[in-house]
């Protein structure tokens, strides 16, 4: 991701704010084409949200996030969201999975431990 892309940074900050207001999360990662500097005009933001509560349904959380993201006014880069609880995400990070790649190479947009 180009650090001087002001529009991208503003959009990602707005996405992060919407997500943190929607769900009690541990971490939010950006991954995919914007991290790898392979984005094109039609690229979307790939966002992975790690939630605290194991009892919450990740699919229900995703739906709430999408609903709140859809309320943004004006033109925006599309957002693709994945949600998983902290324990499962951390376990998947020990295996050769997408989650491990995200934890190692993704851009950490939010970490509850750093914002406290």
Spans of features found by a protein language model:
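Catalytic core of pol beta-like nucleotidyltransferases
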Residues: 1-27, 35-41, 51-116
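Short beta-strand->loop micro-motif that forms the acidic, two-metal-ion catalytic signature
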Residues: 46-50
